[in-house]
Design a protein with these regions (language model features):
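Glycine/serine-rich loop-strand microenvironments at binding/catalytic pocket rims
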Residues: 1-9, 59-63, 69, 94, ...
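Conserved N-terminal substructure of TIR/SEFIR domains
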Residues: 1-68, 98-102, 179-194
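Extracytoplasmic/secreted cell-surface and envelope-processing proteins
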Residues: 12, 75-78, 115-117, 152
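Alpha-helical scaffold elements adjacent to nucleotide-binding pockets in ATP/GTP-utilizing enzyme cores
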Residues: 16-20, 54, 58-61, 84-91, ...
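Conserved TIR/SEFIR loop-to-helix hotspot centered on a Trp-containing motif
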Residues: 46-47, 51, 71-95
Length: 194
């Protein structure tokens, strides 16, 4: 299961995300008994509770998380976070540290120079977040211009995640704490549906 988090304005990327995961599962992953299942807020079942918490519960069931930002930050979800995407990203980091999620991929869509010269509060929040990510040096993110660039970069991630799954299936993986190439994440590896 692969979660996508993004504020509004990135509907094309969200659509591309779901289409790519479905196509990649059929063409590349399915023959290896692996399915990449897309998960987003659109898939969250309506119910009683704080809406963002219901979305968070879906994120907690995922193996990977993908975040995409452009010129909007989103709306506050409560007193702690200034947007749903920020809350989802914080939760994904917590899940990663607890070895409950295997990886986080972060993408930034390029912003026109004219907008960067006079950013409103939404874009300012995105730029501050990006600056923090750059300063902390904990993520190698991808910047892209067109939706097709995002899809191409995401496909590379899927190929990498599929390779990791194969290594896990053979008993030697970055996800295996006893493997020579151990990473900060430990566990038995992703489920056949990732």
């Amino acid at each position: 299961r692969v979660f996508i988090g993004s504020p509004g304005g990135l509907e094309e990327e969200r659509r591309s995300f779901k289409q790519l995961l479905d196509r990649y599962s059929i063409v590349h992953a399915g023959p290896h008994d692996v399915m990449f299942h897309p998960v987003g807020w659109e898939d969250t079942t309506a119910g009683v509770g704080r809406p963002q918490e219901l979305i968070n519960e879906d994120l907690k069931q995922c193996d990977y998380a993908v975040f995409v930002l452009h010129d909007r930050w989103g709306s506050p979800t409560g007193p702690t976070y200034s947007s749903g995407t920020e809350e989802e990203f914080a939760l994904a980091e917590e899940l990663y540290r607890a070895a409950k999620i295997y990886n986080i991929a972060l993408f930034f869509k390029d912003v026109d120079k004219s907008k960067r010269n006079d950013p409103g509060p939404q874009l300012k929040a995105v730029l501050e977040f990006k600056r923090r990510i750059e300063d902390e040096k904990r993520y190698l993110f991808r910047q892209y211009v067109h939706s097709a660039d995002f899809t191409d970069a995401l496909e590379v991630h899927l190929a990498s995640w599929l390779r990791d799954h194969h290594k896990t299936a053979r008993g030697s993986s970055m996800l295996d704490p006893v493997a020579e190439t151990a990473s900060p994440i430990s566990g038995a590896g992703p489920s056949p549906t990732v």
